[in-house]
C-alpha cells in the first residue's frame, strides 16, 4: 500500500478521498478533526500555536520526520499554502511534493503576471489595476496570497474633496479589481503542466462577514453551463495550466453573468470542490476520474496522464446528481463541551467534527455540512437545513 502525506489547513477531504482509493494516509493539518483522524493512519498537527494558520516549523519538522521513515511516496499540499511559496519550496526539499511547484505558484499568484497573461490571450476578466482607483465605487481590493475570500474588501468611498482612504501603496501581492455582476463559479480541473482536463463546473457559495463581503462558505456541483460558456472556460483553464505549468488538481474561479464570464483567479492545488468529485466507499468508480481523483492527481503529476473527458461535463442539461458542502461558522463565542460535540457527531450530514470539547470564537469554522440532490436548488435547501440544525445546537448549548 502506497503511503501518502496530505497537508492543508483542513486535510479531511483529501485524507478521506485518498483513504477511499486505497492509500495509507498521513494527514497534517491545523484542526485534527475526528473524521480526519479516522481517515488516516497518523495525524500530525501543523497548527500555529493558538491560531488557525499553518506553522512553518511544525510543517517542516513533520515532513522531515516522514522523509526519515523512508516509505512515504510524497506529499500533496492543499489549502493554506496559497501565499507561501517559500514554505512550499522548503517542504518540497524535504519530501517530494506531488503537485504544482513553488515557482509556478509564485508566478500564477503574481497579479501582474496572471492578469497580464489573461489580457494578452484575450481571456475575459474584470478590469484590474495595481494602484487605488480615484473613485472607489465598484472596486474591490484583494490579496493574491489570501484564500477563502477573507482578504476581499470593497474600496472605501470618498466624499467630494476627501483624500483617498486607500492612497498608501499596498503590498506587492495586493491589487484592485472591478466588481463584476453575476454568480461566483469555479471549474475543477486536473493538469499535467501542459494541458488540463475539466472535471466539472461548480457554484460557489459566499456570504458577507462584517466588512468582508465575499467570504467562501461552500460549493456545490457539478452544475450545467451553456455549451459555449463551458467550452470557453475550458479553453481558459487549458491556457492557464500550460502557461503557468500547473500540475494536479486545481480550480479556476470565475463570475458568470448569463453567457458572459470573467476569470477571477486560479487555485493551483486541490480545491474545496474536490469533495464533489470523490469516489465514495461502496460506490462505483468516479465518473469524473476513474480510480478516484487523488489517483488521477498522482498520475497527472508523476506520469503526465490526464483522465478521459467526463461525458457531458458542463453540458446545459441536468446532471444525474449534484453534491454540495458548506462550512458552518460560529455566530458567537461558543464553548462546545464533549456532550455537545458527541451530539454534533450524530448529525449524519456533518463533517469536520471537533475531536472533543472545543472553544470557538465568533467566525471560527465549527464543522461542515453536506448534501446531495437532483439539482442545485434542492442541494442549497438541504445545506441550509443542515446549517440551521448546527446553529440551533450551538444556540441551545451554553
Q: PLM ranges: what are they?
A:
Residues 11, 295-398:
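Peripheral (often C-terminal) accessory segments that flank ATP-dependent C-N-forming ligase machineries
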Residues 25-26, 125-126, 174, 324:
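Hydrophobic anchor at the start of a short beta-strand
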Residues 145-147, 179-182, 245-248, 320, ...:
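A short catalytic or substrate-binding loop motif that flags glycine-/basic-rich loops and adjacent residues
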Amino acid at each position: 500500500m502506497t503511503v501518502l502525506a496530505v497537508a492543508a489547513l483542513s486535510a479531511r477531504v483529501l485524507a478521506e478521498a485518498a483513504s477511499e482509493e486505497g492509500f495509507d494516509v498521513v494527514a497534517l493539518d491545523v484542526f485534527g478533526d475526528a473524521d480526519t483522524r479516522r481517515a488516516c493512519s497518523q495525524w500530525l498537527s501543523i497548527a500555529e500555536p493558538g491560531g488557525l494558520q499553518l506553522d512553518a516549523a511544525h510543517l517542516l519538522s513533520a515532513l522531515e520526520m516522514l522523509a526519515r521513515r523512508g516509505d512515504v511516496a510524497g506529499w500533496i499540499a492543499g489549502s493554506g499554502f496559497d501565499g507561501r511559496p517559500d514554505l512550499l519550496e522548503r517542504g518540497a526539499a524535504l519530501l517530494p511534493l506531488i503537485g504544482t511547484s513553488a515557482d509556478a505558484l509564485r508566478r500564477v499568484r503574481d497579479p501582474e503576471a496572471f492578469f497580464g497573461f489573461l489580457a494578452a490571450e484575450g481571456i475575459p476578466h474584470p478590469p484590474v489595476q495595481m494602484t487605488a482607483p480615484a473613485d472607489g465605487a465598484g472596486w474591490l481590493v484583494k490579496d493574491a496570497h489570501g484564500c477563502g475570500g477573507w482578504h476581499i474588501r470593497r474600496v472605501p468611498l470618498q466624499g467630494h474633496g476627501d483624500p483617498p482612504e486607500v492612497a498608501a501603496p499596498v503590498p506587492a501581492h495586493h491589487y484592485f479589481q472591478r466588481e463584476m455582476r453575476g454568480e461566483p463559479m469555479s471549474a475543477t480541473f486536473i493538469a499535467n503542466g501542459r494541458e488540463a482536463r475539466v472535471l466539472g463546473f461548480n457554484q460557489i457559495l459566499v456570504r458577507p462577514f462584517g466588512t468582508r463581503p465575499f467570504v467562501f462558505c461552500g460549493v456545490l456541483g457539478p452544475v450545467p453551463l451553456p455549451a459555449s460558456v463551458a467550452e470557453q472556460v475550458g479553453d481558459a483553464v487549458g491556457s492557464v495550466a500550460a502557461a503557468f505549468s500547473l500540475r494536479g488538481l486545481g480550480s479556476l474561479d470565475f463570475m458568470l453573468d448569463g453567457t458572459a464570464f470573467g476569470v477571477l483567479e486560479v487555485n493551483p492545488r486541490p480545491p474545496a470542490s474536490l469533495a464533489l468529485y470523490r469516489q465514495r466507499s461502496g460506490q462505483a468508480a468516479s465518473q469524473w476520474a476513474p480510480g478516484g481523483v487523488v489517483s488521477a492527481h498522482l498520475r497527472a503529476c508523476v506520469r503526465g496522464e490526464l483522465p478521459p473527458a467526463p461525458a457531458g461535463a458542463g453540458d446545459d442539461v441536468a446532471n444525474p446528481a449534484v453534491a454540495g458542502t458548506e462550512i458552518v461558522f460560529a455566530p458567537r463565542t461558543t464553548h462546545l463541551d464533549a456532550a455537545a460535540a458527541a451530539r454534533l457527531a450524530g448529525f449524519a450530514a456533518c463533517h469536520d467534527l471537533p475531536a472533543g470539547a472545543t472553544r470557538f470564537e465568533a467566525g471560527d469554522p465549527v464543522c461542515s455540512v453536506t448534501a446531495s440532490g437532483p439539482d442545485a436548488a434542492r442541494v442549497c435547501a438541504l445545506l441550509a437545513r443542515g446549517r440551521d440544525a448546527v446553529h440551533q445546537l450551538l444556540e441551545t448549548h451554553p
